[in-house]
Amino acid sequence: MDRAEKAEAVSSLNATLSNAASVVIVRNLGLTVAQSTVLRQQMRDAGANFRVTKNRLAKIALDGTSYTGIGELLTGPTAIASSTDPVAAAKIAVEFAKTNDKLEIVGGGMGDVILDVEGVKALASLPSLDELRGKLVGLLQAPATKVAQIAAAPAGQLARVFGAYGAKEAA
């Protein structure tokens, strides 16, 4: 890599980290290309980003972001997973690490907060923004559905009374 390529890599990673709601640092020693490709695809499907970068360049890219404190986690062969959804990157990394012992979660960050391994696992156990939105819509729709059922119930009962009265008259 020449100086211009390094500068481009740093600015690209800095832009990604500046927009990220959470960042997860993983150690990827021993991952095969196929396993790494599967992990990258899962991250992409979840709207997350997964990059293997030189630690020195990653530390430079962290400057000027809210994640400057996680630079100390960048030792050895590491990769950075980031996402605009606060739980997406953590959730995918933790799930992948459960099935593949070659991927080790080192830590991460969420805003100014530095997370250890347990913090990342706790973050991964939270529901995603889409799941929370679905639950909220369900909670908001439930009372409206009940109100509609209650409002329709007297009319239905009245119709049944008239129907029974009409059947009684006809008989």
From Swiss-Prot:
UniProt KW keywords: Ribonucleoprotein, Ribosomal protein, RNA-binding, rRNA-binding
Domain of life: Bacteria
Classification via Gene3D superfamilies: 3.30.70.1730, 6.10.250.290
A single cellular component GO annotation: large ribosomal subunit
GO MF annotation: an example: large ribosomal subunit rRNA binding
Pfam families reported for this sequence: Ribosomal_L10
UniProt cross-references to InterPro entries, sorted A to Z: Ribosomal_uL10 (IPR001790), Ribosomal_uL10-like_sf (IPR043141), Ribosomal_uL10_bac (IPR022973), Ribosomal_uL10_bac_type (IPR047865), Ribosomal_uL10_CS_bac (IPR002363)
Gene Ontology biological-process annotations: translation
PROSITE patterns with a match to the protein in the record: RIBOSOMAL_L10
Family classification: Belongs to the universal ribosomal protein uL10 family.
PANTHER family according to UniProt: 39S RIBOSOMAL PROTEIN L10, MITOCHONDRIAL
Subunit architecture: Part of the ribosomal stalk of the 50S ribosomal subunit. The N-terminus interacts with L11 and the large rRNA to form the base of the stalk. The C-terminus forms an elongated spine to which L12 dimers bind in a sequential fashion forming a multimeric L10(L12)X complex.
Biological role stated in the UniProt entry: Forms part of the ribosomal stalk, playing a central role in the interaction of the ribosome with GTP-bound translation factors.
Protein name per Swiss-Prot or TrEMBL: Large ribosomal subunit protein uL10
Organism: Sphingopyxis alaskensis (strain DSM 13593 / LMG 18877 / RB2256) (Sphingomonas alaskensis)
Highest classification ranks of the organism: Bacteria, Pseudomonadati, Pseudomonadota, Alphaproteobacteria, Sphingomonadales
Gene name linked to the record: rplJ
